[in-house]
């Protein structure tokens, strides 16, 4: 299966963060520590540590900013990659990362035979948290996630980008213990694409017979049909993910086929054959209303994000919930690249009017604090950087997590 690789804070606070972390692309090359330990560095400040994730792009390493003592994530891609995407992804992050819910990007440059992008280190993904909660989320948790992610996707779309990679692994909470810990972040823009032509300023044309881009479990029906993706497809994929969280699984999971192509065909056929009413049965009508709306959108049409958000905020209020960031995983020990964290119960968000409550999150920062003597970035730089397997990306095999997923007892349920 071919995959198309084409691609809250004010200015003062943002400036402080930039000056503190030394962000922006640098012309500095890679330098070693100059010691016998052979410490691998990215740029002048970032020490490369242990492997914490992998994907078709290459791999992800834990890193440390030696100037600020903050942990970071370092994404590595072979310079001679057959489908290089990291520099384009860096450019997209630069377009997006001045807002809440998108990780800060600190640096892009060479690292030996690799390109390296240094990012803010975040917490567990929604898929990891889903596992932690026995693979079902309550309605309250799903609505708090949905309200935030509609806002995230709207922001991405306002920057002339479509995301095209909706899956729980690509939405992460902030670092446990930080002010960002309750905010849902969107990561991995390796499959993102400009839907507004930067030259003509016009919407990209409608096309058919496109190769599949994304994760088959969540992608829109039109994507299965080979149609060019636009804003509507991101929102439909989100709707499928919301139902996955509520139901625990989707009707098109676990399908068997002799080839990947046949399997994707079966997944698409089952999606089309599953009425929205059946998919959303026993759940609030708003879930079905959401999916009906996004599936009826025209290719060129701008979605009414306020309408979709209001669907869920009204349901949230009628259900008597409080937007207190008390997710289903609150109080559970959370895995991180630097050890398990036992988070405190989240405090009440600052008082604000009702309209703000459901469209903005708490003010965030990314300070990680001083490192202890058991620094997980120390002593790992000499570990070889594994080249990505020479295979095409396929369905759930695409992975770009901000820390290594734990192995599961059974892979069947994830098909």
From Swiss-Prot:
Pfam families: CK1gamma_C, Pkinase. ATP binds at residues 52-60, 75. GO terms for molecular function: ATP binding; protein serine kinase activity; protein serine/threonine kinase activity. Residues 1-17 have a biased composition (Basic and acidic residues). It comes from the Eukaryota. GO terms for cellular component: cell cortex. It is found in: Cytoplasm, Cell cortex; Cytoplasm. Residues 1-38 are annotated as: Disordered. Expressed in both the striatum and the neocortex. InterPro entries: Casein_kinase-1_gamma_C, CK1_Ser-Thr_kinase, Kinase-like_dom_sf, Prot_kinase_dom, Protein_kinase_ATP_BS, Ser/Thr_kinase_AS. Stimulated by estrogen. Its EC number is 2.7.11.1. Residues 20-38 have a biased composition (Polar residues). Keywords: ATP-binding, Cytoplasm, Kinase, Nucleotide-binding, Phosphoprotein, Serine/threonine-protein kinase, Transferase, Wnt signaling pathway. It catalyses: L-seryl-[protein] + ATP = O-phospho-L-seryl-[protein] + ADP + H(+); L-threonyl-[protein] + ATP = O-phospho-L-threonyl-[protein] + ADP + H(+). The active site is at 165 (proton acceptor). Belongs to the protein kinase superfamily. CK1 Ser/Thr protein kinase family. Casein kinase I subfamily. The phospho-regulated basic and hydrophobic (PRBH) motif is sufficient and important for interaction with phospholipids permitting cortical localization. Phosphorylation of the PRBH motif by aPKC inhibits the association of the protein with the cortical membrane. Serine/threonine-protein kinase. Casein kinases are operationally defined by their preferential utilization of acidic proteins such as caseins as substrates. It can phosphorylate a large number of proteins. Participates in Wnt signaling. Phosphorylates MTA1. Phosphorylates COL4A3BP/CERT and SMAD3. SMAD3 phosphorylation promotes its ligand-dependent ubiquitination and subsequent proteasome degradation, thus inhibiting SMAD3-mediated TGF-beta responses. This is Casein kinase I isoform gamma-2. The lineage of its organism: Eukaryota, Metazoa, Chordata, Craniata, Vertebrata.
């Amino acid at each position: 299966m071919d995959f198309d690789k084409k691609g809250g804070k004010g200015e003062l606070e943002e400036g402080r963060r930039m000056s503190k972390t030394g962000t922006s692309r640098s012309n500095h090359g890679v330098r070693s520590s100059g010691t016998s330990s052979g410490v691998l560095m990215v740029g002048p400040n970032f020490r490369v540590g242990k492997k914490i994730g992998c994907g078709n792009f290459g791999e992800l390493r834990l890193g440390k900013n030696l100037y600020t003592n903050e942990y970071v994530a370092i994404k590595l891609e072979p310079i001679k990659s057959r489908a290089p995407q990291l520099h384009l992804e860096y450019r997209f992050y630069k377009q997006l990362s001045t807002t809440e819910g998108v990780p800060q990007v600190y640096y892009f440059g060479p690292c030996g035979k690799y390109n390296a992008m240094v990012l803010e280190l975040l917490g567990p993904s929604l898929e990891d948290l889903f596992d932690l909660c026995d693979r079902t989320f309550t309605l309250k948790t799903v609505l708090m996630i949905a309200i935030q992610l509609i806002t995230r996707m709207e922001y991405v779309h306002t920057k002339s980008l479509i995301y095209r990679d909706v899956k729980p692994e690509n939405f992460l909470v902030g670092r446990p213990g930080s002010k960002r810990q309750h905010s849902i972040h969107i990561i991995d823009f390796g499959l993102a694409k400009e839907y507004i032509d930067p030259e003509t300023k016009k919407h990209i044309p409608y096309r058919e017979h496109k190769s599949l881009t994304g994760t088959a479990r969540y992608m829109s029906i039109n994507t299965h049909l080979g149609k060019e993706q636009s804003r509507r497809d991101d929102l439909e994929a989100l709707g499928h993910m919301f139902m996955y969280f509520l139901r625990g699984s989707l009707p098109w999971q676990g399908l068997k086929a002799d080839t990947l192509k046949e399997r994707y065909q079966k997944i698409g056929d089952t999606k089309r054959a599953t009425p929205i009413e059946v998919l959303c049965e026993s759940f609030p009508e708003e879930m079905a209303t959401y999916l009906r709306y996004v599936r009826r959108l025209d290719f060129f049409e701008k979605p009414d994000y306020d309408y979709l958000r209001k669907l869920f905020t009204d349901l949230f209020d009628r259900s008597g919930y409080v937007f207190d960031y008390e997710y289903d995983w609150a109080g559970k020990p959370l895995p991180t690249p630097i050890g398990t964290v036992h988070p405190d119960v989240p405090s009440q968000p600052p008082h604000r009017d009702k309209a703000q409550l459901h469209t903005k999150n708490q003010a965030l920062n990314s300070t990680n604090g001083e490192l202890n003597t058991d620094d997980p970035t120390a002593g790992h730089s000499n570990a070889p950087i594994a080249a990505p397997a020479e295979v095409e990306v396929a369905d759930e095999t695409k992975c770009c997590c901000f820390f290594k997923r734990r192995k599961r007892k059974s892979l069947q349920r994830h098909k």
